[in-house]
Amino acid sequence: MKILFDFLALYQKNGAAEYARRVFYALLERVEHLPNAENITITCLFDSHHLPAYTEMLPDNLCHKYVDFVDIQNGISEINAQNYDVFFFGCAQNAGWNPQLAELTCKSILVFHDCVWEEFYNNDINLYLAHNANDMFHYRATGPRGKKIYWDIKSPTIRFCRWLLHVRQHGILEEGYNMLQSALALFHKREDNIIVTVSNYSKNSIMYNFDVKEDKICVKYSPERIYSNKMYGMKRATDEKLLRLINSQVKYYLMVSANRQVKNIKKALCAFKVFAKYRLDVFVVTVGYGMELFDKHVDLPFLTDSDLYLAYKSCYALLYPSLFEGFGYPPLEAMRFGKPILSSNVCSMPEILADAPIYFSPLYESAIFNALMSLDDSNYSYYSKKSAKQYEEIRKKQEDDLSELVDMILNEYS
C-alpha cells in the first residue's frame, strides 16, 4: 500500500500542524505493528520552498524504513505517476496555496478544520475586526528617552486607508475567501473521496457553506497534541519573564495566541483592566500580544512548547475570548491541569467544552467582565473539577477518533 501524507501543513507550528503531526506518528506506529508492513510506504508530500517547521520532520532528519519524501515542486504529474492508494490531506485549507493538488488522481481523505473565511464573510467578522482589533488605528513612535507614545490617527483619509488594508488582509475583498475551492475540486474528483472535520459545528458549517452531502463528512475530534517526556518533567521555565511570574505565585489569567486578531484579545484586555480595579490581586498574561496596556497586564514573547506547558500549568484560569473556533485546542490544554475556563460562547466551544466553562459573548466587554467577576476562590474548586472531568471525556474521544482515522487511512490495506 502506498500512502501519500500531507507534510505541507507543517510549514509553521499551529493547530493544523500539530494535528497532522499527531496523525502521522499514530499512523507510523500502527504500520510498525502490522503484518507484512514491508508492503506499506508512507510518502510525505512536502514543499522544498517551505520546509517543515519541526526539525525532526525535515526530509534529511526523518529516516525510517517505511517513510520517504516527495517534493510538490516536482509537479503533480510525477506524483500521480507513483499511483498512490490514498492521499491524507491534513489541512485542506492549504490547497489555496497549492491549487495543483486538485489534479491528484488517487483517493483522498481531506481534513477541513473549519470554514473560517466563509464564516467571517457571512457574518461580517471582517468589519468587526477592522474596527475592534489590536490597536489597528494606533501608530507607535519612539519619544524622548525611548518612551513609547501612542496616539489616535485623526485623519479620516488615513483611517479609511488603514481600514481598507485591514479588510483586504482579512478576506472581505476575496483574498482568502476561496482557500477551500481547490480542496473542494479535489474532493469532487472521485466518488470515494471523503471529508474529515474536527467538530460537529465544523461539519454543519461545511454543509451550510458548500452544500456537501452529510454522509460525505466524517467528524473526528482533533487529537491531543504531542507532549514530550521532557515537558512532563520540566519544572523551570526557560523564559526569564515567565519564570519570575511563576516564582511570584501571583494569580494570573492566561490568554494565548494573542497576536491573532480573531482571538479578540483587545476587547478582553479592556474588560480585564476594569476587573483589576475590583480584584487587586490578579493579573492577565498574554502570549505574543506585543505590548502591555496597563499595570496588571503582562505580555510574554512567543514561548517554547515546554514554557507554554508551564504557563498553562501555573495559571489561575484561562480567558478565551475567541471570535471563531473550528475545534479549540487552548481550553483543553488548560483543562488538562484542571484550570477553570472563561470562554466565548460561539462556534465549536459549547460542543467541545460542554458545561465546564463560564461562557460569555465575545462581542461585549461587559459580558467578559461579568464572566471574570463570576469566578472567585469560593467556586474555584467547582469549576476546576468540571474542567478536569470534561478534559478526560474529550481525551477519551480524541483517542478513539484518532484510532478510527488511522483505520480510514489504512482502509485499502489487507
Residues covered by each model-derived region:
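Carbohydrate transferase catalytic cores enriched for Leloir-type hexosyltransferases
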Residues: 1-414
